[in-house]
Amino acid sequence: MEEKKSKVILHGTWISTYSKRVEIALKLKGVLYEYLEEDLQNKSESLIQLNPVHKKIPVLVHDGKPVAESLVILEYIDETWTNSPRFFPEDPYERAQVRFWVSYINQQVFEVMGQVMSQEGEAQAKSVEEARKRFKVLDEGLKKHFPNKNIRRNDDVGLLEITIIATLGGYKAHREAIGVDIIGPVNTPTLYNWIERLQDLSVIKEVEVPHDTLVTFIQKYRQKCLQQAANA
């Protein structure tokens, strides 16, 4: 851990994949921090003041200075605490590829995951088909651009790995809650292998949501979405 006397506070929510990204990043760097759970149905005045533009989590407060948006926060953490692991490769092309696939997950993958979770019947079947296509693209991209990736310890984790495990690490809970199988050793072997190796790391175990808790949340969230759609 790098010696740095400072006050670090993270405003987040336990279920947010964006909050999890920041938690993982802080733990990887060995940064001591205070965690404040926010109720997004009743946002605190401090959250609104710290992030007046979006009024969203996560917000990192470092020595009284707020930083918002998960990707911006992760870059800030990496530039402020320069000890290992570094979240971006030194090679410019590899760094560009990391940014590209993080963007792909944030836009293409996250979107279709939400559709699969909140739909049923024919609409869901179409979204599942689209999800499998997008996940296949991600899987092939990881295989092509990061062929020598070996995840064995915390120092092997960077921005892309953080994004993958925070966003997709709960795929087994999604499968149990929704009954849809997308990630697996046959469908997405490279992605599956990355996730399995990441889940073996101690830093990931520290922040992961218990399986049964996540299943229950997804089921309740799905029912809420379906009820809202029925009443629309």
Curated annotation (Swiss-Prot):
It comes from the Eukaryota. Pfam families: GST_N. It catalyses: RX + glutathione = an S-substituted glutathione + a halide anion + H(+). GO terms for molecular function: glutathione transferase activity. Residues 91-226 form the GST C-terminal domain. One of its GO terms (cellular component) is cytosol. Gene3D superfamilies: 1.20.1050.10, Glutaredoxin. Keywords: Cytoplasm, Detoxification, Transferase. One of its GO terms (biological process) is toxin catabolic process. Its main location: cytoplasm. It is found in: Cytoplasm, Cytosol. Its EC number is 2.5.1.18. Coiled coil: none annotated. Residues 6-85 form the GST N-terminal domain. PANTHER family: GLUTATHIONE S-TRANSFERASE U10 (PTHR11260:SF775), GLUTATHIONE S-TRANSFERASE, GST, SUPERFAMILY, GST DOMAIN CONTAINING (PTHR11260). May be involved in the conjugation of reduced glutathione to a wide number of exogenous and endogenous hydrophobic electrophiles and have a detoxification role against certain herbicides. Belongs to the GST superfamily. Tau family. This is Glutathione S-transferase U10. The gene is GSTU10.
